[in-house]
Amino acid sequence: MGSTGVSGSAGVSAIGDETTGPTGQSESPFVYDLRLNEGSPESYFNELATFSDEVLDQIEKQAGAILDRYIEYNELILQEMPTSRGEAAMDLLTVGAVTSIYGASAGRVPAWVLRELQKLSWKRDRPALTTGMLRDALFAAFMKVDLGRRVDVADRSPRFSMEVEQLPHLIEWLQCTIDLGESSRRLINWLSLLRTLTPSQASDWMARVQDLFDWFQTAAGEALGNYTRGVSRFLAARRPSENRRPDRFLRGKKAAEYHLAMVAAEIGNRGMRHAFRRCPRKLVIVPACMRGANARTSPGGQSAGLDVTCEGCDPSCNVNKATALLGLSEARVYLENCPRTSVRLAARWSQEPRTGVVIAACLAIMPSVQAATRSARMTCQFLPLDFPGCQSHWLRHRIPATSNESELVWLVTGSKLRRL
């Protein structure tokens, strides 16, 4: 299985120079890297498909009855758009992950700070500059990430046992983090369901979804940890100045969160595959970090607010290669500056009727993209970038990101042979 573009280590990394693992073999310098087993029978996408089946089986075994009730409540009471059973299962696993990982961090922030941050996000009676300065000051003082602890692949993040009455505070905290806000909708729905139960039953269900995540952390580390060996090095290398970065929660994700994003993308693709194939029009949206050396001068890179397409100016550009690869499929390739602005992305592309959209994005950003497109009722398939290559969040010097060309063709056309 090849990748669209070159492998791209180029001696510059998110952390430093290329490192050597305990076996003496060189390790990828990136936070995650999906190319490590490229070309082997046990490639990333095959391993992911197998593990995703295991995850769904485990959720059915541990929480099948809860899943039944969650789906029924969302569709009949909350009037949510129907989703596949697999996607609903991932909602439960996400609730377990978010409450376990971020419950303690949220609890350290006073409620008044969260209220003020939310007010400042929409306040109109102050000048924009003043509002922004006040919000930035509160954000920097209270919304901090934990620094300095090395988290190895096999290490399980300590679980925070979430009480049901603590969920509203966690939801407000998530909405203030910028990069974790996509999880708040699922927690809001989950809290609404728990409030229909007796206190003891609600506590039991809360503990059971956290138990699911406990199992997932260990199982995913064994199945997918090979692809996220760089996470622990990256987290350990962060400095105190990290807490002045607006993207600190994006950069601070644990290995288990990357694994969860991998499985969620796979399950989401399965759930929408048939609807996507029925769409008469196909689009592919790739991030600007895939552009080549001529990106700053490319006519296709000067959009002036219009949709950006490849002009074929640079034969070595990964966007050009993806465009050429899909030439016969009639799928049009467009560029987005960064899918991190997923709400804007969804607002723009959800206006395209009867259109299936393939979105390529970094795994750290993928959950936000999935949540935004799901809320916008878009028919999508999701392709993770092979590694995060942008200078804005990860690297000292940008390295053009790549994507797996076989998987891209499979998602768009269904022509690649791979186990469903």
What are the residue ranges of the model-derived segments?
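Proline-aspartate-enriched helix->loop->beta-strand connector
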Residues: P353-T355
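C-terminal functional extensions of proteins
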Residues: A360-L420
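Long, compositionally biased, glycine/small-hydrophobic-enriched stretches that function as flexible linkers
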Residues: M1-C279
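A short, acidic, amphipathic alpha-helical segment used as a generic capping/interface helix at domain edges
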Residues: P339-S350, A364-S368
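Short His-Asn-centered micro-motif
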Residues: V263, I285-P287, Y334-R340, V358-L363
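Redox- and metal-dependent alpha/beta enzyme cores, enriched for Fe-S-associated oxidoreductases
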Residues: M272-V333
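Well-ordered, non-membrane alpha-helical segments in soluble/globular domains
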Residues: Y258-N269, E311-N320, E405-S406
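Short, solvent-exposed amphipathic alpha-helical segments in soluble enzyme
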Residues: P299-G305, S350-Q351, T373-R377
